[in-house]
Amino acid sequence: MLSNSDSKHGQKAYWCVVSGSDLWLVDGQLPLATSNELNLVAEKAQKIGSYNNHPVMWLNEADVEQSLEMHSLRECLHFPEPLFLLMSKAIQYGHMTQTMRFCPQCGGRNHLNHNQLAMQCGECRTLHYPRIFPCIIVAVRKQQHILLAQHPRHRSGMYTVIAGFVEVGETLEQCVAREVKEETGIEVTNIRYFGSQPWAFPSSMMMAFLADYHAGELKPDYSELADAKWFTSDNLPPVAPTGTIARALIEQTLLNMRSDS
C-alpha cells in the first residue's frame, strides 16, 4: 500500500479510482500523479500492480471527498492492454468490497485484507476472494459465413458472437455447444480454444473459442437475442469494438475465411 510518506517523497502513481464499472479519467487518461497532487488519501489506497515503472493504485470513489468525473471502463478499450487489465482488476476489487460486506458462512462483517486482497470475516476469519464467473464466447463459421447475433441491450445495432455462462458440471466445450444450440438452434463441431480476457462487467472471465457449423437451421431464441444471421466478409454489420475478445474472434474468423477462399 502506498503510504503518505511515499507521496511526500514525490512518488507518482497511476490512480484507478472506481465506482461500479466506472473509473476516474482526466482528459481521457488515467491520472498519473502523487496522492497529494490529486488530493487523495493514500492510506485508503491499495497497490494492485505496476505500469511503466509506476505503481498502479486502486481506490474506491466512496473514499474520495471531491467530486470526480467518472467514465465507463468500456471507454478505455483502446488503452494499452497491460494498463487496461490493471484497470479491470481495480474495478473487480471495488466490486468485491461493495458486494461482499458480510460473511456468507456466519454473517459477520467483512473487511479488506490488504495482504491477501480478499474480504475477511471479523468473526470467523474466513477469507472471501473476488468472485470470478466463467463464460464462453465463440465465433461460429459456416464455409464463407460467420454467425453474428444482436442482443436487445445493443441499441447501436452492434452484432457480436455468441456468449454465455458456464453451468455447474459442464466442460467449456460442452458449454460452447449448449449455448450455441440454445440461442441459435444450430449444432457446432471442431471446437477449439482461442484465448481469454478478463471482463469486469462486473467479474467475468471470457474464454474464447472457434467452432464450425455442423447441423441445424438457424432459429434465434428471441427471448435472448434480438437477431442472429450468417454474414459474409463483405456485408458485415457494426461489430464489437477493437480491444474486446469478441472483435478478435471475428477478425480471426474473417482471416481464416480469406485464407480458405
Curated annotation (Swiss-Prot):
Task: State the free-text cofactor note.
Answer: Divalent metal cations. Mg(2+) or Mn(2+). Binds 1 zinc ion per subunit.
Which prosthetic group or cofactor does it need? Mg(2+); Mn(2+); Zn(2+)
Coiled-coil segments, which residues?
A: none
Q: Where is this motif: Nudix box?
A: 164-185
Q: Which domain of life is it from?
A: Bacteria
Residue ranges annotated for the Nudix hydrolase domain, each copy included:
130-253
Pfam families, per the entry: NUDIX, Zn_ribbon_NUD
Record-level GO BP terms: NAD catabolic process; NADH metabolic process; NADP catabolic process
| Residues holding a divalent metal cation 3 | E179, E183, E224
Keywords for this entry? Hydrolase, Magnesium, Manganese, Metal-binding, NAD, Zinc
This entry's Gene Ontology molecular function terms read: magnesium ion binding; manganese ion binding; NAD+ diphosphatase activity; NADH pyrophosphatase activity; RNA NAD-cap (NMN-forming) hydrolase activity; zinc ion binding
Which cystines does this chain contain?
A: none
Q: Where does Zn(2+) bind?
A: C103, C106, C121, C124
Residues bound to a divalent metal cation 2: E179
Q: Which residues bind substrate?
A: R74, Y129, Q197, P198, W199, A200, F201, P202, S203, S204, A246
Binding of a divalent metal cation 1, residues = A163, E183, E224
Which Enzyme Commission number(s) are on file for it?
3.6.1.-, 3.6.1.22
Please give the HAMAP family that the UniProt record associates with this protein.
Answer: Nudix_NudC (MF_00297)
Q: What does this protein do?
A: mRNA decapping enzyme that specifically removes the nicotinamide adenine dinucleotide (NAD) cap from a subset of mRNAs by hydrolyzing the diphosphate linkage to produce nicotinamide mononucleotide (NMN) and 5' monophosphate mRNA. The NAD-cap is present at the 5'-end of some mRNAs and stabilizes RNA against 5'-processing. Has preference for mRNAs with a 5'-end purine. Catalyzes the hydrolysis of a broad range of dinucleotide pyrophosphates.
Name this protein carries in UniProt: NAD-capped RNA hydrolase NudC
Q: What is the lineage of its organism?
A: Bacteria, Pseudomonadati, Pseudomonadota, Gammaproteobacteria, Vibrionales
In the UniProt record, the gene name given for this protein reads nudC
